[in-house]
Amino acid sequence: MEVGVYYYFHLPMEQQPDYLTFTQQFGGSDAPVPSVMDLILLQKGARLDFPVQIGPRSPHSIALDWENPPRNDRTYWKERREWMKQRREALLGVTSYSATYAYLYLEPREIRFEILVPLLTLETWLPLQREEADYLSVAEQDAMEKALPGFLQEVCQTHIDGMEIIAQLDRLDFFTLDIRDFAKKQERKKVGVANARVGMILSFPTKGNFQSASLEWSFFNEVTPLLNTMTYVFDQPGERFFFTDNERTWQWQSPKHASGPQVSSWLSLPPVPSMPTMPLSLLFLLAAFSGGAFALKRNWKIAVPLLVLGAWFGWWNPVWQQMVIPHPTKEAPLPTPPEQNKIAEVLLRNIYRSFDYLQDADVYSALSRSADGDYLEKLYLQIKKGLILTEQGGAHSRVRNVQWLESEPTSHSMRAQSFSLSVKWEITGTVEHWGHIHTRRNAYRAELEVKAVDDEWKLVDLEVLDEDQVESSTQLRGSA
């Protein structure tokens, strides 16, 4: 038997709230047949949105626009559709406050599974005792963070090239309704249970290019009968996948003959000018003639054999003819200012390319082609620090573009075959989370020194004087 009850609530408000959250538990928590409530919300007498069905323990939140409230005229719903499109962009695709969103990323460094779930939904996965019925304290959030890894490792299994990789809970954040950018690290504070959302990031590290991967999600209940997931494979457009009780596993196989993302091509450096040399035989000739001339003044019988011996070593001996020594009075020419600019630019671009590699040993090996060994560790830490976005919870930015702006010579040493420049460049990097892309462009001004080491140009010092953020933007990741 079906029974319907109609209620009309009029809510006077002293202030204009940005959000309203509705919950219902008609029939109590032990009702044999769960109740369903149709919610129709009116703002200033006009319907705000389409009717929404709300089940038990399924809160529904809605944003209120007081500057452009709903109207009853016919053009309103056409404007509403355009507004909803703009709102989707503003909310970065997360348009429902009560839905669960999941994002699966295949990247060269890791496989990453990100889940954004209402707190009340999460409590149906992993029950947690609360001191207050309507709030979750910071201590209780910390307790949830300790309990979640074990639960997630049971319900989420991942294999890379046939080997099981244990899930690591990298981040756990608790969001309120006013949060737009879920990638930003949140300070923990007491949150309301009815409208809080939980963001969790699971990572599965890789050891280089891989050929196959699979992820299985095995937890489903009445509140979460499926897990709506956007999958992003490297730089390809996103595709939607639904984890269900009948289809628990998502699988990926690398296309035939593919070997995964490759490191950007290496740029060639101009050669180091050769040091001026002189034949070793010429040194013997000079020594012989000098000694012979000195001996000739005293005893010609000694001078003649000395001249003959010096001539044989210096001129007729083929071994000494092939040997050379640095010229005592000449020095190697330094590159011209345009050539110095080119050398510094190529070195800097190759240094950033080194961080396309996955393992630290490979990064170091690539860096050694552009920097002197004594400077490697400092350079590695310096560049890596610049690629980490602290506001995104320590995420590693992927370099998309290196734009060389200008350089100006400051000093040089012909004998040491070194030169110094004042340089400016810009780096554009991206980080992806929750279905959207963070792009950051930073400008740098620095003093650098380049030196010829083992007949190759190497960076031996880099001092960053200024670092400024030129541009920062966030946009939705495209789908197929």
Q: Which positions does each model-derived feature cover?
A:
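N-terminal soluble domains immediately following signal/targeting peptides that reside
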Residues: 1-279, 365, 372-375, 387-391, ...
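Secondary-structure-rich domain cores
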Residues: 110-111, 115, 202, 291-294, ...
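Juxtamembrane and targeting peptides
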Residues: 266-358
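Core segments of small alpha/beta cavity-forming domains
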Residues: 335-398
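C-terminal soluble interaction/assembly domains
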Residues: 355, 371, 395, 408-417, ...
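Hydrophobic/aromatic beta-strand elements that line small-molecule binding cavities or substrate pockets
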Residues: 401-410, 444-452
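Extracytoplasmic/periplasmic C-terminal soluble domains
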Residues: 445-480
